[in-house]
C-alpha cells in the first residue's frame, strides 16, 4: 500500500520569513515557543535528541528517507508554494531532484493560498495568490515538469500526481487543469492526475469537479466538518461564500479569521481524538474517487496560541489500532491502494510521525506494525 505522508518544508531560513518574523525564523521558532494552555496540555513538543534540523542539510534528508523506509512510509507529499511565478521554500525539493541518493518516492501538493500573517492574528497579506492566464500556467508547468519526469515522482498509471490544496479558490480551475492535461500529453505522459485536498471543495456540489480525478478525505478536517455539520450550517455557508469571493477578487485568504469564535460556538476547540477517529472509521466514502486519509494528532496552538485547536486523547497505541482499521477500509471499502497521512513533520500543528522526546518512535512503530499486520508493508 502506498502510504504518503504530507511534508512541510518550512524548516530552513528564507529572506521573506526573516523580513516579517525575524532573522532565522523557521517552523521551529513556533514549536520552541509553544506554551501549555490547560492542565494536561503537553507543550512544547521537543524533537528526540533536540533534533531541530535544517532541511537544507543533506544529512537531514537522508535521515528522513531512511526513517520513512524503515517504518513503512511509501513517500512524501511536499507542499509546493508558487505565487504567479514566485516561489517560496523550494530549495529542499530542488536539492532532492539533484540527489539520487534520496531515493524515496515523492509528489507535490500545491499549497495555493496567500502567504500571510493570519496565524499571528494580523490580516497582513505578504504575498497574495493570483493565477494569471496561459502564459503563467505554462511557466508553472515548465517548473513542475522537471520533477514529474524524475523516476522517484509518484505516478498513477504512469500519470504524475499533483495534489491541489484548495481548488475552490482558483477561478480558472477548469481551464488551467485542462491546459495542463494537454501539456502532459505533449511531454509524452499518458496524462496527469489531479487530486483535491480541500474538504470545502469536496463537500460543495456547486463547484465544478470535472477536472479533479480524486478527492482526498483530508483528516482531521473532514471529521471536524462531519461532527459539526449541523451547527450554524447556513451561517457557515454564508461565511465561506463571502471569503471565497474576497480571495478570488483580491488574492486574500481570510478563512481562518473568525474560526476561533466558530470553534467556541460549536464546541470544537477541544475535540476528542477518539470521536474523530470513530467518525473516520464509520463514515462512507464521499464518492468512488475518494482517497482515505489518517491523522496522527492535531494541535495547532504553537501557531495560533489560545485561538488554536487541540485534539484530546491521542496516543501511539490508539493510533496503531485506528490506522490498522483504516488500512483495511482503504482496501475493502474504498478499493484503493493509496492512503495519505497527516503528517510527517507538521510540528506546528501537532501532526508528526518524526520521533519526539515524549513518544520516541512510537507513532512510526505504530505505522510499521499496522502495515505488517495487514500485509501491506511497502518496502
Q: Which residues fall in each region the model found?
A:
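Acidic-and-aromatic substrate-binding clefts and catalytic sites of carbohydrate-active enzymes
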Residues: 11-13, 52-59, 79-91, 170-172, ...
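Aromatic-rich peripheral "rim/lid" segments of glycoside hydrolase catalytic domains that contact
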Residues: 26, 36, 96, 342-345, ...
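Conserved, mostly hydrophobic/aromatic
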Residues: 5, 68, 158, 292, ...
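Aromatic-lined substrate-binding rim segments of carbohydrate-active enzymes
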Residues: 59-108, 290-292
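N-terminal regions that are enriched for targeting/export leaders
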Residues: 1-63, 69
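Substrate-binding cleft of secreted/luminal carbohydrate-active enzymes
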Residues: 314-355, 377
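Active-site groove signature of glycoside hydrolases
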Residues: 77, 112-114, 120-124, 141-170, ...
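Aromatic-lined glycan-binding groove of carbohydrate-active enzymes
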Residues: 3-7, 15, 172-313
Amino acid at each position: 500500500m502506498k502510504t504518503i505522508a504530507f511534508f512541510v518544508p518550512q524548516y530552513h531560513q528564507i529572506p521573506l520569513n526573516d523580513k516579517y518574523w525575524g532573522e532565522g525564523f523557521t517552523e521551529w521558532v513556533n514549536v520552541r515557543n509553544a506554551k501549555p494552555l490547560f492542565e494536561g496540555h503537553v507543550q512544547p513538543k521537543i524533537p528526540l535528541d533536540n533534533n531541530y534540523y535544517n532541511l537544507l542539510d543533506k544529512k537531514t534528508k537522508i535521515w528522513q528517507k531512511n526513517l520513512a523506509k524503515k517504518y513503512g512510509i511509501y513517500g512524501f507529499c511536499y507542499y509546493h508554494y508558487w505565487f504567479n511565478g514566485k516561489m517560496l521554500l523550494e530549495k529542499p525539493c530542488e536539492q532532492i531532484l539533484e540527489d539520487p541518493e534520496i531515493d524515496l518516492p515523492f509528489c507535490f501538493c500545491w499549497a495555493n493560498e496567500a502567504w500571510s500573517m493570519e496565524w499571528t492574528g494580523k490580516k497582513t497579506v505578504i504575498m497574495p495568490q493570483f493565477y494569471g492566464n496561459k502564459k503563467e500556467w505554462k511557466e508553472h508547468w515548465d517548473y513542475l515538469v522537471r520533477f514529474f519526469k524524475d523516476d522517484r515522482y509518484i505516478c498513477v498509471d504512469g500519470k504524475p500526481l499533483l495534489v491541489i490544496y484548495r481548488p475552490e479558490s482558483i477561478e480558472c480551475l477548469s481551464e488551467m487543469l485542462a491546459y495542463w492535461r494537454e501539456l502532459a500529453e505533449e511531454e509524452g505522459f499518458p496524462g496527469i492526475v489531479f487530486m483535491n485536498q480541500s474538504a470545502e471543495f469536496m463537500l460543495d456540489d456547486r463547484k465544478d469537479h470535472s477536472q479533479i480525478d480524486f478527492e482526498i478525505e483530508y483528516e482531521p478536517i473532514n471529521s471536524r466538518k462531519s461532527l459539526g455539520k449541523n451547527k450554524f450550517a447556513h451561517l457557515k455557508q454564508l461565511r465561506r461564500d463571502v471569503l471565497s469571493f474576497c480571495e478570488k477578487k483580491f488574492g486574500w485568504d481570510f478563512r481562518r479569521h473568525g474560526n476561533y469564535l466558530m470553534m467556541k460556538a460549536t464546541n470544537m476547540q477541544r475535540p476528542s481524538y477518539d470521536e474523530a477517529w470513530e467518525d473516520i472509521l464509520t463514515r462512507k466514502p464521499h464518492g468512488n474517487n475518494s482517497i482515505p486519509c489518517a491523522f496522527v494528532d492535531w494541535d495547532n496552538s504553537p501557531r495560533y496560541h489560545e485561538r488554536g485547536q487541540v485534539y484530546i486523547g491521542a496516543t501511539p497505541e490508539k493510533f496503531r489500532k485506528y490506522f490498522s482499521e483504516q488500512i483495511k477500509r482503504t482496501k475493502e471499502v474504498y478499493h484503493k491502494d493509496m492512503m495519505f497521512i497527516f503528517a510527517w513533520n507538521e510540528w506546528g500543528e501537532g501532526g508528526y510521525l518524526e520521533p519526539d522526546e515524549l513518544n520516541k518512535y512510537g507513532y512510526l512503530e505504530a505505522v510499521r506494525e499496522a502495515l505488517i499486520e495487514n500485509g501491506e508493508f511497502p518496502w
